[in-house]
Amino acid sequence: VTYLDELRDVIRRLHGVESTHVESVPIKETFQGKTVWEGIVEVFDLKNHPKAARIYAWAYERDNAKKPRHVTVLHMGPVTSPLLAVRAAIVQEYRNAEAES
């Protein structure tokens, strides 16, 4: 199973639709001069999704390298680019961490 196939499977499982890979976009997000996220965001077109025609997806390693964390962000509302998808995911993770503490 390739990385893109893995992401397609995650999209299918989470959103219930098929997807087609469009492009890979390198993103480097910095905050106060420090890199807070750097990686490749995969862009997919969605087939028959009720709210969005496109989705951004990526994975990153956590403590267990065999179980990466997969992230998907729908192209809707304020999220209109791979960079904005990364920013939205960072904000969401921060909020989740705040809620847990």
For each predicted feature, which ranges?
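Mixed-charge, Lys/Arg-enriched low-complexity segments
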Residues: 1-6, 65-101
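N-terminal export/targeting and maturation segments
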Residues: 1-24, 95
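Low-complexity, compositionally biased segments
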Residues: 8, 12, 48-51, 66, ...
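Acidic, low-complexity, intrinsically disordered interaction modules
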Residues: 20-84
